[in-house]
């Protein structure tokens, strides 16, 4: 069975209706027998909104905390995508970066990443988000 990585940017997951549309595209690939890994961005405009909240909170913010706040948008979208796929009877779960794990350099806001291999459980054929 082939592996397919599908990436959805902020505009394509901008709201719940668009997440459902993206999930239908994932479902089509699953129906064709593919193992799918889904990567999602934050919903359109959410990263800027989160960054504005940081700026409203602190004039001289810590880059580590800025990254923690701003990256939460992707986590929300991943959870919503997993829930949408589950509603379609497709086994799915979201993963946070630390669960994969995704390792980074310590250069906050401009870190380089190193991604470990993700294990997809063959018996469940779970969609990984």
Each language-model region and where it sits:
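Nucleotide/pyrophosphate-binding catalytic subdomain
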Residues: 1-125
